[in-house]
Amino acid sequence: MARLIARLRTLLFTNVSVRLNLFYYRRVWGMQIGEGTRISRGAKLDRTFPGGITIGRDSAITHGAIIVTHDFVNREHRPVKIGDCCFVGYNAVVLPGVTVGDHSIIAAGSLVRPRIT
C-alpha cells in the first residue's frame, strides 16, 4: 500500500509540476512551446528575450539543460528554435541563434553553437 501511495504521489506531483512549468513559460514569459512538450523544473530557459524561444511539440528539455537567447559580450539577442520531437539532454547548453531540426537528440553535456567551423 505504501508503494502505491508513493507512486501516486510521484505521478501527481510530476504531472502538476510539468503543467505549471509550461503555463509559466507560455503565459507569463510568452515563449512558444508546443503541445506535449515537457520541460524539467531544473531546466533553465533564458528570460532576457523570452519571445525568441520556440520549442516544437512533443519535445523534452531535461534537468540542467540551458537555452540561451542573448550574448552578454555583444549585447545581442538571437532566437533559438527547437523542432518537434526533440530531446535536449542533461546539462546541455544551446546558444543563441541555434535552430535544432525535428527529431533531433542533443546529448547530455553538449554545447550547441549556431556555426561550427
Regions found by a protein language model. Name each.
Residues 1-30, 36, 103:
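Terminal amphipathic alpha-helical/low-complexity segments used for targeting or macromolecular assembly
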Residues 18-22, 42, 47-48:
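Short glycine/threonine/proline-enriched tight-turn/helix- or strand-capping micro-motif at secondary-structure
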Residues 35, 40-41, 46, 56-57, ...:
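Left-handed beta-helix
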